[in-house]
Amino acid sequence: MASDGRVERIASSIRAIPNFPKPGILFQDITTLLLDPQAFRDTTDLFVERYKDKDITVVAGVEARGFIFGPPIALAIGAKFVPIRKPKKLPGEVISEEYSLEYGTDKIEMHVGAVQPNDRVLIVDDLIATGGTLCAAAKLIERVGAKVVECACVIELPELKGRDKLGDMPVFVLVQADESV
């Protein structure tokens, strides 16, 4: 990782909010990162530097905050951007993948044909916690025959062991955060 101060600037620009959205949670708020143009640029630059020579053809952003970081990365590396959304948000034909939550299940979707079998895909989200959403996104991509090159997140909550759920899928994160209040 770059030792030029960018990661430290990014980490210091992320606000931790205790007891949000419920008691006992320390919420990692990236909106303060977005308010700092240099930290925001550093974030996208670090991802671009990592992926510019990896022949990525698709950057898939996971709703909602993957939509913030994914498009500038896609533009900079010459890849298309594909949104992976919550159910019933995309018009037209979609494919979906269900995944488990702490209580119950949820689902994510993408347009049929948005990702092709020969595509090399980077999945982008703001944070990896339990790994459920990223795992579902990877399954969705792999179901159409494409290759997930890596999952890229700004923040990781290592205590929640999200990488374990992803198995041997490569994951790259900029900031390790503490989840305890």
Curated annotation (Swiss-Prot):
Q: Where in the cell is it found?
A: Cytoplasm
Query: Which GO MF terms does the UniProt record name?
Result: adenine phosphoribosyltransferase activity
Keywords on this record? Cytoplasm, Glycosyltransferase, Purine salvage, Transferase
Tell me which Gene Ontology terms the entry assigns under biological process. Answer: adenine salvage; AMP salvage; purine ribonucleoside salvage
Q: Which PROSITE patterns does UniProt cross-reference here? A: PUR_PYR_PR_TRANSFER
Q: Does the keyword Glycosyltransferase apply?
A: yes
UniProt keyword Cytoplasm present: yes
Predominant place of localization: cytoplasm
Assembly with partners or alone: Homodimer.
Q: What is this protein called?
A: Adenine phosphoribosyltransferase 1
Its lineage opens with:
Eukaryota, Viridiplantae, Streptophyta, Embryophyta, Tracheophyta
Gene encoding this chain?
Answer: APT1
